[in-house]
Amino acid sequence: MIDTIQNILIQTSDFLWSYVIIAVLICCAVFFTLQTRFVQFRLVGEMVRLLLHPDKVTPEEIGKDELSADVRVNGEMKHISSFQAFVVALASRIGTGNLAGVATAISIGGPGAVFWMWVLALLGSASAFIESTLAQLYKRKGKTSFYGGPAYYMKYGLGKGWMGILFAVLMIITFGFAYNSVQSNTICLAWQKAFGIEPATMGIVLTALTLLIIFGGIHRVAKFSSTVVPVMAVVYLLVAVGVVAWNITCLPKVLITIVENAFGFNQAAGGVLGVTVIQGIKRGLFSNEAGEGSAPNAAAVATVSHPVKQGLIQALGVFTDTLVVCSCTAFIILVSGVDVTASNGIQLTQDALTHEIGSIGNPFVAVMIWLFAFSSIIGNYYYGETNVRYIKDTKLGVFVYRLAVAAMVMTGAVVSLDFAWSFADITMALLTLCNLVAIVLLSRQAVFLLQDYRQQKKEGKNPVFSKDKMPDIADKLEAW
């Protein structure tokens, strides 16, 4: 029975990714890139500035008597900053996809898959800009924080409440359940290989820690992410840079191999070119989530004076995830010279790093995947919770969702790798299609906001948005 279900999942996943998703994803990314006049390249400097030097947003700047995203604790005002929203999204992005996903793409699609991951990031960051800007535009005011995401711009922007519910359900299934089972599965495999710990035992520990964090709400999620994500990223990057530096003479050959394999310039690669493209884009999307509709859930929470600010920051997150972290994993695997067909997933990354730094490689990757994947579990959980609240904002509903997430974390620890990935691939495909339709239809609004932002910057102002600038939809913009 399980084998039959697994075969159905694999066949469905192959069909969606071979004939539908890749074409739609790339076409939309190119469309947004042209529509925004290459915003992801023109404003890289502004992205970095916004992240490193966030504006101090005052109530007057956003035209409110008080910031509705603020939380009064002991008389003090708190809010979710742009940086915290960035790292909550990055916590979800930087996870299994960066270590295990890259390895899977290379083992199945060859080194050329890395090139197509880069292509998706470079073009897809425009999609990330559009979706996160729209999420900021249509965000809502809660009792303790702003909230929003694709479900909200589908309902209030398109006037399609049913589409918002469909997206919310897919979001809950994809991030709360499917992705978290993959993250759990990868952690358990890594720790079994490194320390001999049984997956079921590790699953229990992982589930307990997940419950501890998620019952603390968005502010605990944001605090955890803003503490853990920068540290783990820096540590991993330092090791990766060290490995690449040690093998610097091999780097030109690796880059040539990636490009040759990407376009089938040699006989061996030519026969599997389609697989190379599919694996690169599939695993690239799993990792950077550009256009998938996930990061907007975090982007909507931030307190900013203009929607474009969070759109730019989330576009930077795509670059950080794929061009930096994923590339590091790819270079570690390819410069090591290990047989990429001998193992799969996280075990390939472990084998490559062990080859380079010795026996400490296995436990190092196990610890890093714990931090990467566990931070993703927490970020994924929050995305799902936002959409649970969209469907029915009740304490019971959120409580049941939290228990269901914990159950899927435990389930992921003991199911097969193929089953976990196939399930995630299908739900990811459906979710992405739903979101892309919405942001294509609403993209002109994001472009208008970008033009307004640029005009204010030219005038030497700190860009501030007011719904009076968009009178046709002003009644839909609750937070502005």
Regions of interest found by a model, annotated:
Residues 13-53, 105-144, 320-326, 362, ...:
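Extracellular loop-to-transmembrane helix junctions
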Residues 61-106, 134-137, 143-151, 155, ...:
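Alpha-helical membrane segments and immediately flanking helix-loop junctions
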Residues 1-89, 96, 107-112, 441-480:
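N-terminal alpha-helical transmembrane segments of multi-pass membrane transport
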Residues 129-139, 143, 239-257, 265, ...:
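Extracellular/periplasmic helix-exit of transmembrane alpha-helices
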Residues 22-27, 164-172, 193-218, 235, ...:
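Transmembrane alpha-helical segments of multi-pass small-molecule transport proteins
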Residues 32-33, 120-144, 150-151, 155-185, ...:
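Helix-loop-helix module between adjacent transmembrane segments
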